[in-house]
């Protein structure tokens, strides 16, 4: 097969750092490079391989490094992807025609390989990005974030899923290009690629829509430290296309009446986080005012995450657009690049979490084990681990639910370390746990003096027992009494059935009063001792009665 001069002159392919041999290029059918700002970059090389030489003798093999660059008509070269081979796909077709497809991804695919369960303590989102980039062998380009989280849990997520979720929450981009992991605010300015309709811009289909456009975004949450509502709001975003349209989406939408998007299902820890979340969501909305697809000829410099400056589209649509994905296709006809403008987010993360909702992994209750009760704030909080999630994953501080809980009021029983408890999460977010209460099991038995009841009957005993064995027991009919019993057996019984109070103590009994003490009986009163009885007063002793008998 003769070499394809158009195709081979427009691309350069390196395998493990070495330009592939010319005889391999003569077998090349097509090259596809797919770039996204929110998905791993992908490449696919298709070769004729009727003699099966590439399949059996290489040089392409799994895990090898592939770099692909494209050239403009002036000879300027632009890197398109630096990736690794993850799949080999031979195709044995009719007529004894065989093709060999080499497929791979940029190094961000390493962050998709394994789901992990772990907790991060006192960490910022930008710290996570730097840490994950290093683990994947990538350099990091990170815009610093300011909020420090006491505890963040990666719950059965891949590193990139988790990082993309964090990026979505604060309105950041998260993608890999040129061997770098980018974790940054979407750019609002920068160098752009100029394209002219009728020349190198082959086609462009924009769509201007007021769907979802609002004038304000408000985030409402709760600050338990100060016991106040948290409200973050904004009326501006930064992802409008920089075109000559006279009004932005919010202004146009205001013609229908002022619109507001209120977010109440995403827990926030502070006023600043609420404001950041509001800005992120408003920015996301502004990016959907103008969406578009376009195509250009021989422009490898069109890259995801960069700007294109479109010329010749009239007064309204000429201007700068931020590219969110670009697909470069090399065929015998030459290099064609299609690109999209899709606002802040498209692809994997937005499919998973929707436009306005967080990831709600845990809408129900889960089992946990208490690991720490030494709450530095003295709120009665505890930390727990989730045995089904991993032995090393510990939560942040979880507040307890107590009957009648309020200011210096309510029933508080902090569970001990090692106790099994039932936990729920605020709006399903695993980083905001609440402990509903403790559980009994095959090891942790129910308290003594507690019974069950046959069908149709109600249990006759209710009890509360401390860790050391002190207990309060309430008996309904027929016994009808309340017992307060210490671990050593000292007991006070309020007997409703027999209309009496019993104080049972094998040691001393002492009654003290700061002022007067009075004991009154409508019937008889009896004082009896096996030993002596002493009556002593610093003042006068008066004994009165209808008759006084002294024996």
Question: Locations of the language-model features?
Answer:
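Intrinsic-disorder/coil detector with helix-boundary
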Residues: 310, 514-551
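Short, Lys/Arg- and Gly-enriched loop/turn segments at beta-strand edges
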Residues: 73-84, 315-324, 428-438
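Juxtamembrane "anchor/assembly" segments of surface/extracellular structural proteins
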Residues: 1-63, 105-109, 196-198, 205, ...
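Surface-exposed, non-catalytic interaction/assembly patches
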Residues: 19-24, 112-119, 161-169, 177-244, ...
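Surface-exposed cap/loop segments at beta↔alpha junctions
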Residues: 54-139, 152
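Short beta-strand-centered interaction patches in the first periplasmic/extracellular domains
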Residues: 2, 7, 92, 99-108, ...
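Amphipathic, non-transmembrane alpha-helical segments in extracytoplasmic/periplasmic proteins
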Residues: 43-47, 104, 113-141, 153-178, ...
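Hydrophobic packing positions characteristic
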Residues: 332-343, 348-529
């Amino acid at each position: 097969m003769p070499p394809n001069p158009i195709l081979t002159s427009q691309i350069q392919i390196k395998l493990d750092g070495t330009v592939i041999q010319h005889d391999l290029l003569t077998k090349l059918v097509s090259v596809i490079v797919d770039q996204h700002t929110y998905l791993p970059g992908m490449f696919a090389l298709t070769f004729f391989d009727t003699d099966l030489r590439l399949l059996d003798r290489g040089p392409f093999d799994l895990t090898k490094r592939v770099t692909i660059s494209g050239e403009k008509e002036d000879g300027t070269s632009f890197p398109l992807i630096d990736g690794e081979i993850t799949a080999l796909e031979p195709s044995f077709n009719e007529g004894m025609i065989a093709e060999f497809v080499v497929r791979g991804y940029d190094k961000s695919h390493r962050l998709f390989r394994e789901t992990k369960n772990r907790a991060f303590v006192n960490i910022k989102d930008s710290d996570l990005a730097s840490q994950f980039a290093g683990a994947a062998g990538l350099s990091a380009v990170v815009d610093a974030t300011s909020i420090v989280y006491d505890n963040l849990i990666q719950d059965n997520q891949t590193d990139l899923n988790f990082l993309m979720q964090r990026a979505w929450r604060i309105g950041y981009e998260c993608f890999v290009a040129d061997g770098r992991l980018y974790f940054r605010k979407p750019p609002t300015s920068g160098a752009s690629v100029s394209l002219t309709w009728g020349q190198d811009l082959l086609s462009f289909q924009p769509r201007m829509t007021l769907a979802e456009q609002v004038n304000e975004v408000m985030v409402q949450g709760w600050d338990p430290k100060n016991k106040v509502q948290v409200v973050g709001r904004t009326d501006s975003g930064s992802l409008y296309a920089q075109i000559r349209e006279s009004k932005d989406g919010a202004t146009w939408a205001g013609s229908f009446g002022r619109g507001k998007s209120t977010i109440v299902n995403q827990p926030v820890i502070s006023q600043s986080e609420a404001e950041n979340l509001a800005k992120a969501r408003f920015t996301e909305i502004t990016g959907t005012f103008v969406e578009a697809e376009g195509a250009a000829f021989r422009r490898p410099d069109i890259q995801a995450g960069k700007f294109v400056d479109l010329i010749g589209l009239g007064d309204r649509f000429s201007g700068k657009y931020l590219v969110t994905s670009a697909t470069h296709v090399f065929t015998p006809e030459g290099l064609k690049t299609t690109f999209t403008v899709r606002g802040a987010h498209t692809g994997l993360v937005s499919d998973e979490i929707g436009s306005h909702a967080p990831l709600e992994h845990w809408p129900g209750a889960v089992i946990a084990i208490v690991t720490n009760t030494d709450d530095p704030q003295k709120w009665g909080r505890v930390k727990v681990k989730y045995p089904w999630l991993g032995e090393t994953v510990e939560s942040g501080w979880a507040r307890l639910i107590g009957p009648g809980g309020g200011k210096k009021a309510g029933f508080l029983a902090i569970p001990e370390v090692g106790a099994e408890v039932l936990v729920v999460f605020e709006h399903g977010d695993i980083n905001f746990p609440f402990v509903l209460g403790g559980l009994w099991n095959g090891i942790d038995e129910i308290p003594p003096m507690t019974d069950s009841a046959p069908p149709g009957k109600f249990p006759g005993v209710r009890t509360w027992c401390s860790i050391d064995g002190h207990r309060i027991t309430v008996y309904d009919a027929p016994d009808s009494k309340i017992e307060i019993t210490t671990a050593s057996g000292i007991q006070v019984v309020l007997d409703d059935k027999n209309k009496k109070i019993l104080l049972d103590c094998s040691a001393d009994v002492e009654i003290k009063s700061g002022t007067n003490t009075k004991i009154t009986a409508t019937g008889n009163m009896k004082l009896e001792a096996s030993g002596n009885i002493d009556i002593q007063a610093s003042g006068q002793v008066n004994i009165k009665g209808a008759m006084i008998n002294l024996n």
